[in-house]
């Protein structure tokens, strides 16, 4: 079992309060899905969009995640693009993923066959 530092955050009342205070229902939906991604797995922006019923809005998901720190601490590092590419300019993302056991096929791309949350 991989140690997940985010799992304790999900169990606290303070955490639930932060989520319930979101003014944007869409952001709430997106971040609720993101917090379900287990350590050692990744999901794509498109997969998250599809799960919330907005299949064509992967860029919207990316936009919400770029401001997720406004809502609390979420494991946004577990979200990559449809090719498994990590976010350009976010150097820490790879380190966070590797610490959870996520494997990479090259410098910037997660091994999606091995690490995809939704298959």
Predicted regions and their residues:
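Nucleic acid-binding interface residues in structured DNA/RNA-binding domains
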Residues: 2-119
